[in-house]
């Protein structure tokens, strides 16, 4: 079977790898010069199934209003003048209730836990290296109210069988020794020992090389213009004015998926939520993290690679604007210096990327009303966490194999206005 995968971020490359491993003849098309050159390039480096939590949560509307007036706020909304932005925010607000939160978190956890298992199996099979560590995630709380609020998430962790440890302020240094210097600023934390870390860019490029050895044909610097439709099937994809054909097609264009599918009348509710990161060389290892921490107050993750610290976070709704905002830069610097001042800020690199976010925070993985078009997009902040599981899942769906986990609620069908099958 011939399959064309559109997109060479971590989701597209993982999809191609698993398809090829199961015998498909795969071609990957991308406008960039290589794999992982956009959203997968500089993310926070966390592989954290336990923190697969919907942004659309009870209390978020109130918090969003409060953040509008807060310095170093984790969320910024810049109206871009489009009706689509307002519609997407309205859809998200509809999910900010306990019932929707529970449904969406279960779906996210299902994919994320499966994905971690797939990653471990892949690592065992291939020996792939990407500055990976398996030392867990530590969520940090600066306020007692945060410690109390986390009980809701702990109940879900228990239901899903996820190992965790709730720590008081004095116990944080046992997990992250460098936090002994910031103990007076923290009241406690939630430690998930089974989470992992790694450089998504290194992983994606290494996996692409492995996929090439399996026969995957990567074509970069391609202007992927449109899908050619005939009835209820895709007949080809127009690239640089020419039409390439396959038996089946997988769309993994991230934030650009929605606009690409507009001519097909598939209304994909994926909005680009802008995030930022710093990559900092380590000069004082004793003041650097061992694994990854998540500052609950500022919604910023600080992750250890081999000789670098990756600091990522923020959420900015401003359309496809890729400008670097110095206020966000200052926030990332402030949180890093506050907790782990072991890097050389003078040598730090500042980056931004667009996360493909759905209003319910759950990715869109599965079939469409077109018999041979499949979607693997909308992973939001969790593309790295969910990549391998999503790739394996979509490969099984495309090839009509039995899936390892339930696909309930993951396809575009959950959005009735999308005309999905």
Curated annotation (Swiss-Prot):
> What cofactor does its activity depend on?
FAD
> Can you name this protein?
D-amino acid dehydrogenase
One of the entry's Gene Ontology molecular-function terms is: D-amino-acid dehydrogenase activity
Question: Gene3D superfamilies, from UniProt?
Answer: D-Amino Acid Oxidase, subunit A, domain 2 (3.30.9.10), FAD/NAD(P)-binding domain (3.50.50.60)
Q: Which InterPro entries match?
A: DadA, FAD-dep_OxRdtase, FAD/NAD-bd_sf
User: Pathway, per Swiss-Prot/TrEMBL?
Assistant: Amino-acid degradation; D-alanine degradation; NH(3) and pyruvate from D-alanine: step 1/1
Reactions the enzyme catalyzes = a D-alpha-amino acid + A + H2O = a 2-oxocarboxylate + AH2 + NH4(+)
Q: To which species is this protein native?
A: Acinetobacter baumannii (strain SDF)
Functional note? Oxidative deamination of D-amino acids.
Alphabetically, which GO biological process terms does the record hold?
D-alanine catabolic process
Q: Hey, which family's this protein in?
A: Belongs to the DadA oxidoreductase family.
**Residues bound to FAD:** 3-17
Q: Does the keyword Flavoprotein apply?
A: yes
Instruction: List the keywords (alphabetical).
Output: FAD, Flavoprotein, Oxidoreductase
Q: Which PANTHER family match?
A: D-AMINO ACID DEHYDROGENASE, SARCOSINE DEHYDROGENASE-RELATED
**Family matches, as Pfam families:** DAO
Q: Which GO terms describe its cellular component?
A: cytoplasm; plasma membrane
**EC numbers on record:** 1.4.99.-
């Amino acid at each position: 079977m011939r399959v064309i995968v559109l997109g060479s971020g971590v989701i597209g490359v993982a999809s191609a790898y698993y398809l090829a491993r199961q015998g498909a003849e795969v071609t990957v098309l991308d406008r960039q010069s290589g794999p992982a050159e956009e959203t997968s390039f500089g993310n926070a480096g966390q592989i954290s199934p336990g923190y697969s939590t919907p942004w659309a949560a009870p209390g978020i509307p109130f918090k969003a209003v409060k953040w509008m007036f807060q310095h170093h706020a984790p969320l910024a909304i810049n109206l871009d003048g489009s009706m689509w932005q307002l519609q997407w925010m309205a859809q998200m607000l509809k999910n900010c209730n306990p019932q929707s939160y529970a449904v969406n978190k279960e779906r996210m956890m299902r994919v994320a836990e499966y994905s971690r298992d797939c990653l471990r199996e892949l690592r065992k099979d291939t020996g792939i290296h990407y500055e990976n560590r398996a030392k867990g995630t530590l969520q940090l709380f600066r306020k007692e109210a945060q410690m109390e609020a986390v009980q809701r998430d702990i109940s879900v962790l228990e239901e899903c069988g996820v190992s965790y440890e709730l720590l008081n302020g004095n116990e944080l240094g046992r997990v992250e020794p460098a936090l002994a210097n910031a103990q007076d600023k923290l009241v406690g934390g939630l430690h998930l020992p089974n989470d992992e870390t790694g450089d998504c860019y290194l992983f994606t490029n290494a996996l692409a090389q492995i996929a090439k050895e399996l026969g995957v044909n990567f074509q970069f610097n391609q202007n992927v213009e449109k899908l050619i439709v005939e009835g209820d099937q895709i007949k080809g994809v127009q690239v640089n004015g020419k039409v390439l054909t396959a038996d089946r097609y997988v769309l993994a264009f991230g934030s650009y998926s929605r606009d690409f599918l507009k001519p097909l009348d598939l209304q994909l509710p994926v909005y680009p939520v802008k995030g930022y990161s710093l990559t900092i060389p380590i000069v004082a290892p004793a003041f650097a993290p061992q694994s990854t921490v998540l500052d609950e107050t500022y919604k910023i993750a600080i992750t250890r690679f081999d000789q670098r610290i990756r600091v990522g976070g923020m959420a900015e709704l401003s359309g496809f604007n890729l400008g670097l905002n110095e206020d966000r830069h200052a926030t990332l610097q402030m949180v890093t210096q506050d907790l782990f001042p072991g890097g050389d800020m003078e040598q730090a690199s500042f980056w931004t990327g667009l996360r493909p976010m759905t209003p319910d925070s759950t990715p869109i993985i599965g079939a469409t009303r077109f018999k041979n078009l499949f979607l693997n997009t909308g992973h939001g902040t969790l593309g790295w966490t969910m990549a391998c599981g999503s790739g394996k899942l979509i490969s099984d769906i495309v090839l009509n194999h039995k899936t390892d986990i339930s696909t309930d609620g993951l396809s575009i069908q959950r959005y009735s206005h999308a005309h999905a099958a």
